[in-house]
Curated annotation (Swiss-Prot):
Lineage: Bacteria, Bacillati, Actinomycetota, Actinomycetes, Kitasatosporales
Biological process, per Gene Ontology: antibiotic biosynthetic process; fatty acid biosynthetic process
Domain of life: Bacteria
GO MF assignments: 3-oxoacyl-[acyl-carrier-protein] synthase activity
Domain Ketosynthase family 3 (KS3): 10-413
Note: This putative ketoacyl synthase lacks the active site cysteine.
Associated pathway: Antibiotic biosynthesis; curamycin biosynthesis
Protein name (database record): Putative polyketide beta-ketoacyl synthase 2
EC number per UniProt: 2.3.1.-
Pfam families reported for this sequence: ketoacyl-synt, Ketoacyl-synt_C
Keywords: Acyltransferase, Antibiotic biosynthesis, Transferase
Gene3D superfamilies: 3.40.47.10
Gene (UniProt): curB
Length: 419
């Protein structure tokens, strides 16, 4: 997998486990039920210290108790975004039918870890900065040096589970989620048995929110029902969210041999870069990424049965995405269903695309989830709204970052799909 896509792949990778921590569910099954029903959980922000900020609406992960899931040793040295990732990784391994001991039975070097993150540990960092300026440097805890770092989740999953295979972190803005999955597939193709891959974000600490206020794409509307409505004439930006998802990616033949349920296969990926907030240029860049992903997957445009849209919620960006689909899919574009479940939970930056993959893999249940809160579509796309539709089999997942990264990823259904 390279930046532009480079022909049909000779080995396929399988997604055998999915772990989710999201505003609408702390488990993959509850997440899927919510997105299938088109539920919106966007709400007024309740975090202490955020009362006077202009950002009013977000997707908060509520009811998450990290102390019930993660050992104290790891809790004290990690931020909330890593707590999400650790919990999702545990759930993904369980979903894949892999205990940590079984995963490393052959060798601890047979399992790798790849994550993506956009900002790192804002909540932990804010607390320690307050100590620095309020009490003095000797009161700053030693774990500040690692907890804020965007690579922390990769390191802590690896250390906690004893996974010593290839590990890494992808930093390509919001598109990093798809790029991380592609990198994980590449690692498996090169000989690693299993890769734990994902992205989870926690951008709702006051410090983190202040850092986001410089984004002109951010919605500051106070009404959760209209704050995030991409592809409409009322589009006014996006709302942020916490959470994300972790996948277990392994070599497909190995998965079949151990009797694993294959949720999907990673068929193709490509990425481009078109510059920060240059939404007019993102049309060409996104179309090129789609072409590359289709080429690598050996997939004709008419084989794509649903598009999980990036859905920025900015008029210029939405228009560029709609036109990119026409450029890449040609005559098939008006007929392919497009969906954006994230309008019901918010954009969890790098985690958003992983949640879309989780929803795409969830189409084994036979339905395309709808796009909450969106009805008056002003672009020539077949957006799935209000209720779910019967599912087909080849999702195309799109993601763009505020700094100009574009990515596209093609999934193929697992053998047990009902699509």
């Amino acid at each position: 997998m390279n930046g532009s896509g480079s022909g049909i792949r000779t080995r396929r990778t399988a997604v055998t486990g999915i772990g989710v921590v999201a505003p609408n569910g702390l488990h993959a099954d509850t997440y899927w039920k919510s997105v299938k029903e088109g539920a919106s959980v966007l709400d007024r922000i309740t975090r202490e210290g955020c009362e006077h900020l202009p950002l009013r609406v977000a997707g908060e992960v509520r009811g998450f108790d990290p102390s019930a899931l993660i050992e104290e040793t790891f809790l004290v040295q990690t931020d909330l975004f890593t707590h999400f990732a650790l919990a999702a990784a545990d759930a993904a391994l369980q979903d894949a039918g892999l205990t940590k001991a079984a995963a490393v039975a052959d060798s601890p070097y047979s399992v790798g870890v790849v994550t993506a993150a956009g900002s790192g540990g804002g909540e932990f960092g804010q607390r320690e900065l307050q100590k620095l300026w309020g009490q003095g440097s000797r009161f700053v805890g030693p774990y500040q040096s690692i907890a804020w770092f965007y690579a922390a989740s990769t390191g802590q999953i690896s250390i906690r589970s004893g996974f010593k295979g290839p590990c890494g972190v992808v930093a390509s803005d919001e598109a990093g989620g798809l790029d991380a999955v592609a990198h994980a597939a590449r690692v498996v193709e090169r000989g690693t048995d299993v890769v734990v891959v994902g992205a989870a974000e926690a951008p709702l600490a006051p410090y983190s929110m202040v850092c986001q206020l410089g984004y002109p794409e951010l919605s500051t509307d106070e009404d959760p029902a209209i704050a995030y409505r991409p592809f409409t004439s009322a589009a006014r930006g996006f709302v942020p969210a916490e959470g994300g998802a972790v996948l277990i990616v392994e070599e497909a033949d190995r998965a079949h041999r151990r009797g694993a349920v294959v949720r999907a296969t990673v068929a193709g990926h490509a990425a481009t870069f078109t510059g920060a907030s240059h939404w007019d240029q993102s049309r060409e860049g996104l179309a090129h990424a789609i072409h590359g992903a289709l080429d690598e997957a050996g997939c004709a445009p008419e084989e794509i049965d649903v598009v999980f849209a990036d859905a920025m919620g900015v008029p210029e960006a939405d228009r560029a995405e709609a036109l990119a689909l026409v450029d890449a899919l040609g005559r098939h574009a008006p007929r392919v269903p497009v969906t954006a479940p994230k309008t019901g939970i918010g954009r969890s930056y790098c985690g958003a695309a992983l949640l879309d993959i989780a929803a795409g893999a969830g189409m084994e249940h036979g339905q395309i989830p709808p796009t909450p809160n969106v009805f008056d579509i002003c672009h020539q796309i077949d957006l799935v709204t209000a209720t779910a539709r019967p599912a087909s089999s080849a999702p195309l997942v799109l993601s763009r970052g505020l700094m100009g990264s574009n990515a596209a990823l093609v999934l193929r259904p697992g053998p047990g799909s009902t699509a």
